[in-house]
């Protein structure tokens, strides 16, 4: 037991992150099912809108901070990056340990905040004055703020660790453009986290002081401005959505490269520059979340055009994935299915994002279900599809076992139908101007809402099926005999790898024939 509590091994800590993420994911999914059951027909089921809004808030926090980030950055980052770089472990193993162990208490505090009344029914954005003491007079929002602080500290420590690992523990003679795409994506994600999280910490600390110490940062009666909070929050919030998707881009790139049988992804260097471009542009478009707060027309014009420009590097990535698949004979195995599903659905989410980047259109669509449909296409079918496809793809590496291929294909089809049936109708609801975060609606919206709720039940069944498939493989212990057609360093290990895969950092030597030889020195 102490092996897990005090471990400084990147593989053990990666497994802990994955377990926490799975647990939080089940919790967050349960909350989304409660939301969809409430909305499956007109009329009230929960009969208390404060509780409904609390469920919406908790669903968002759980999925973002305790499911996607621990899975992609903590889980896969810890597990795969040292193996892909050929390094013995992370740069700061003990810091790695504490950056995980800050997450369970943070999760506990988030769940504890729901036990007070009024519970935090603010939405994940926690806008004042709704989150101020006047409208949430219990300690609930304070607990949520402390939870955010702890997970933020955890993320910053994990990011520093990953950055130093990628910069200092790669092969000594390797150039940066030779580092594979997943370490690159996590490196850029770490930069985004380190630059954006302190701004969030400042914003929620000011909110904490407004609530408890009678300051008025966000209170107009004392000369403050609630719009200041929105600017600070979204300066973190927009890079955050790229933090959620960029590691997924890196993982999907590896899967596409491996499954197409190519030695490298199409336009490897362009892919790196595209991710750098996305990371940079992500910081200068935050006010597109605020088109309705009364921005100046020139400001709206700037944020509209800057947001549209983000589509360019994203399009480069999508077409490079498709170009990598071009010309190879596709046998539709499970990794290819998931990667193609990711590319297709993420692209749909990107196109609805282009629609919303127009400030004139966004004035109409802001805070409707069109926005919910958009960001669930890029998160629930971008980030989550990246997580599931990567988990299935690297499961034989992590455990040395095989999943049941036929069942996985059935599960993929169920999931694909379920998520599309859930979120595609929400665009229609948004165009019919159904607002977000409301527990009841006129019966003119009944048809699409009932279809959406049916889709969420299909998705739930597919996730239960996936858990069953994983448990079945762990119980039956089918070992993997042959591994082939892999272009990445991590597959050169035993399956599962030893606790310490590399005892020292390898050296890459290029001889006169320009063939690379990997030797230990």
Swiss-Prot record:
Recorded superkingdom = Eukaryota
Q: Which Pfam families match?
A: COX1
What is the membrane topology listed in the Swiss-Prot or TrEMBL record? Multi-pass membrane protein
Residues bound to O2 are: 242
**Covalent cross-link 1'-histidyl-3'-tyrosine (His-Tyr) as placed by the record, residue numbers:** 238-242
Q: What does this protein do?
A: Component of the cytochrome c oxidase, the last enzyme in the mitochondrial electron transport chain which drives oxidative phosphorylation. The respiratory chain contains 3 multisubunit complexes succinate dehydrogenase (complex II, CII), ubiquinol-cytochrome c oxidoreductase (cytochrome b-c1 complex, complex III, CIII) and cytochrome c oxidase (complex IV, CIV), that cooperate to transfer electrons derived from NADH and succinate to molecular oxygen, creating an electrochemical gradient over the inner membrane that drives transmembrane transport and the ATP synthase.
- Protein name (Swiss-Prot/TrEMBL): Cytochrome c oxidase subunit 1
Species, as recorded: Apis mellifera ligustica
Gene of origin?
COI
């Amino acid at each position: 037991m102490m092996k897990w509590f005090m471990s400084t091994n990147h593989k053990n800590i990666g497994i802990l992150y994955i377990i926490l993420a799975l647990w939080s994911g089940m919790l967050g999914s349960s909350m989304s099912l409660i939301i969809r059951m409430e909305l499956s027909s007109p009329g009230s089921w929960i009969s208390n809108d404060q509780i409904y809004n609390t469920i919406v808030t908790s669903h968002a926090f759980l999925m973002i901070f305790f499911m996607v980030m621990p899975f992609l950055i903590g889980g896969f980052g810890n597990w795969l990056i040292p193996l892909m770089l050929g390094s013995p472990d992370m740069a700061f193993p003990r810091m790695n340990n504490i950056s995980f162990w800050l997450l369970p208490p943070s999760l506990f505090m988030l769940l504890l905040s729901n036990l007070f009344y009024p519970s935090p029914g603010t939405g994940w954005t926690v806008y004042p004055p709704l989150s101020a003491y006047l409208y949430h007079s219990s300690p609930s929002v304070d607990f949520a703020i402390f939870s955010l602080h702890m997970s933020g500290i955890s993320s910053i420590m994990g990011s520093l660790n990953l950055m130093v690992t990628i910069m200092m523990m790669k092969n000594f003679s390797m150039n940066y453009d030779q580092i594979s795409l997943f370490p690159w994506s996590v490196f850029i994600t770490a930069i985004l986290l380190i630059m954006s999280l302190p701004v969030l910490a400042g914003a929620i600390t000011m909110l904490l002081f407004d609530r408890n110490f009678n300051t008025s940062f966000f209170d107009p009666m004392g000369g403050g401005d609630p719009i200041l909070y929105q600017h600070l929050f979204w300066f973190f919030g927009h890079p955050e959505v790229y933090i959620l998707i960029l590691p997924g881009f890196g993982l999907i790139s590896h899967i596409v490269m491996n499954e197409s049988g190519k030695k490298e992804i199409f336009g490897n260097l362009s892919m790196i520059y595209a991710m750098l471009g996305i990371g940079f542009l992500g910081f200068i478009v935050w006010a597109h979340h605020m088109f309705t707060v009364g921005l100046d027309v020139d400001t709206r014009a700037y944020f509209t055009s800057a947001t549209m420009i983000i589509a360019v590097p994203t399009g480069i990535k999508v077409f490079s994935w498709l170009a990598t698949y071009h010309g190879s004979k596709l046998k539709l195995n499970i990794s290819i299915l998931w990667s193609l599903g990711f590319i297709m659905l993420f692209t749909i989410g990107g196109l609805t994002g282009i629609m919303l980047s127009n400030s004139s259109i966004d004035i109409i669509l802001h805070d409707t279900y069109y926005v919910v449909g958009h960001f669930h296409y890029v998160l629930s079918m971008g980030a989550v599809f990246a997580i599931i496809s990567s988990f299935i793809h690297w499961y034989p590496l992590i455990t040395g076992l095989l999943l049941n291929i036929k069942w996985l294909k059935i599960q993929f089809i169920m999931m694909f139908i379920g998520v599309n049936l859930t979120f595609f109708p929400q665009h229609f609801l948004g165009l019919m101007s159904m607002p977000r975060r409301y527990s009841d609606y006129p019966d003119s919206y009944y048809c699409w809402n009932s279809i959406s709720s049916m889709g969420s039940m299909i998705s739930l069944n597919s996730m239960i099926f996936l858990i069953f498939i994983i448990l079945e493989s762990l119980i039956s212990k089918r070992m993997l005999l042959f591994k082939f057609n892999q272009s990445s360093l991590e597959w050169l290990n035993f399956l599962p790898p030893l606790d310490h895969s590399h005892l020292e950092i390898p050296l890459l030597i290029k001889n006169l024939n320009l063939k690379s030889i990997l030797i230990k020195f």
